[in-house]
Every structure is written in C-alpha cells, then in structure tokens.
Curated annotation (Swiss-Prot):
Its main location: cytoplasm. This is NAD kinase. Its cofactor is a divalent metal cation. NAD(+) binds at residues 73-74, 147-148, 158, 175, 177, 188-193, 247. GO terms for biological process: NAD metabolic process; NADP biosynthetic process. The active site is at residue 73. The gene is nadK. Belongs to the NAD kinase family. Involved in the regulation of the intracellular balance of NAD and NADP, and is a key enzyme in the biosynthesis of NADP. Catalyzes specifically the phosphorylation on 2'-hydroxyl of the adenosine moiety of NAD to yield NADP. The lineage of its organism: Bacteria, Pseudomonadati, Pseudomonadota, Gammaproteobacteria, Enterobacterales.
Length: 292
C-alpha cells in the first residue's frame, strides 16, 4: 500500500447487477491490498457483506481520502453533490451509458485504479452551481448542481415568461418553455441537446440556454462564473420548478425569485494519467477521426 490514499470509499448504484459485481470485486481487491475501505450502507446491504465498515455519503466524505463511484453519470452526479462538500477526491467506474464523468473502463478498472492509487492521476476542480428559491424576508430553499439548474413548468409543458438579471443588472426577458443554466461539466449534457456550446472543464464560465424560445433572437449566452443570475417572473403562478441535475426539484411559489451562483466549494474529480478530455468528446459524440 502507498501513502497517496489510505481510506477509500465505495459508492454508486446499489441495485444494478453488473454494478454490484464491480462493487464486490472492488471491495475484496482493496481489502487484499491493505486499504481501509468504507462501503456505502445500501451497497453493503445488497452484497450482504459482514464485518465491513459502512457509512453514508457524508460520512464517507468526512473519513475517506478517495471515493470510487460505480455506475453511470447519474450516480456520479448524485454522489458528487454531497462529496464535493468535503476534502475528498472522486473517480468513477462506468457502469452506465455515456460515462462523461465515470471514465474508468469496468473491464480494466483494476489496472487503471492501481495506477491511480500509486499516484499516477490528474485532478480537475469542477465547480458546482447553487440555486436558491427565495422571497424577501423569507427562508430560502437551496440546492446544488454539478451539471445544470433548469427552470421549467412543474407538470404540463407550457410557455413561461420571465426576466433574467445578471449581477442585478437586467439582461433580457424571455418567453420560452424554460431555461438551462449550465456549468462547463454540464455543457455536454442537457445543455448540449438544447443547442448550447461545449465548454472545456477548466473554463470559469456559465451558459444560459433557452428551451424552445418563442423568438429567433433568443440565443445561448456565456457569462463569467463569478456572476449571480436572478430569475423573475411576470405572471405569478404556482406550477414552476427549478431542477438540479434532473434529480432535485424546488417548487417556485408566488412572489419568489430564483438566484443562481457558483458554489463556494468544488468537486475534486480525478482521472487516469492518460485521460484526454478531447478524446472523451470524440469517442462519446462520434466525432470524425484524424485525417492524417
């Protein structure tokens, strides 16, 4: 065992059969190599592991040096929103579909992870967004997002009228089905499917991408990540929502605004030493190969 990581947490999809196989392999392999291992409680229950140290995501974030997330990007997003609050590094083994965030190959995970555990890795600091639904002199409802914060109707799709302020200065008004506010990490997710630009992970930028706008002049906008975005609504209604990473929904009540800003903390995402962001884009999006 080396000195780069001493305590490793295992988290991810607790009920997917192939993911559970990877969880079990990972647990036994890490224990055999002498690491202290903490297994997320639900995973330990599904695997029927005995005499194993278990913990919640928050406890793993507090105690472990590295968290290995087994699953797809959705599992990574769910875990990362909690783990980003702590001084812990995170890496993913892909048991999902695209795998933009979980980039270890499950068939070669042992060797790739062995190299990482020896200190052969690169680290990226991915920032999060914080969304607040608030009314003057009232308690705020707050959530965070790794990928994006989305304004949308709560149930049936319909047009929304709203104003966008950037650093408390009016920027534009819009009539559309919603708005996607994305980090660079999320620029290859929902934002991309709505026509937004791809941002490299190190950019300090946020994108605002309209969803089915009712005018051809509405275009994606890229702003500095230090800016604060305020959304105000022309017709007070009780059927609007803000969703974070398509996993957490915050309802917007009459008279409330939405504030979106960069989080004070970030996700320490690590990759194998040979990781290339542009190679990942080319592979996942089916870009053309080199000509010569």
């Amino acid at each position: 065992m080396n000195n780069h990581f001493k305590c490793i947490g295992i988290v991810g999809h607790p009920r997917h059969p192939t993911a559970l196989t990877t969880h079990e392999m990972l647990y036994r392999w890490l224990c055999a190599k002498g690491y202290e291992v903490i297994v997320e409680q639900q995973i330990a229950h599904e695997l029927q592991l005995k005499n194993v140290k278990t913990g919640t995501l928050a406890e793993i974030g507090q105690l472990a040096d590295l968290a290995v997330v087994v699953g797809g990007d959705g599992n990574m997003l769910g875990a990362a929103r909690t783990l980003a609050r702590y001084d812990i590094k995170v890496i993913g083994i892909n048991r999902g579909n695209l795998g933009f965030l979980t980039d270890l190959d499950p068939d070669n995970a042992q060797q790739q992870l062995a190299d990482v555990l020896e200190g052969h890795y690169i680290i990226e600091k991915r920032f999060l967004l914080e969304a607040q639904v608030c009314q003057q002199d009232c308690q705020k409802r707050i959530s965070t997002a790794i990928n994006e914060v989305v304004l949308h109707p709560g149930k049936v799709a319909h047009m929304i009228e709203f104003e966008v302020y950037i650093d408390e200065i009016f920027a534009f008004s819009q009539r559309s089905d919603g708005l996607i506010i994305s980090t660079p990490t999320g620029s290859t997710a929902y934002s991309l499917s709505a026509g937004g630009p791809i941002l490299t992970p190190s950019l300090d930028a946020i994108t605002l991408v309209p969803m089915f706008p009712h005018t051809l002049s509405a275009r994606p906008l890229v702003i500095n990540s230090s800016s604060t975005i305020r959304l105000r609504f022309s017709h007070r209604r009780n059927d609007l929502e803000i969703s974070c990473d398509s996993q957490i929904a915050l309802p917007i009540q009459e008279g409330e605004d939405v504030l979106i800003r960069r989080c004070d903390y970030h996700l320490n995402l690590i990759h194998p030493k040979d990781y290339s962001y542009f190679n990942t884009l080319s592979t996942k999006l089916g870009w053309s190969k080199k000509l010569f």
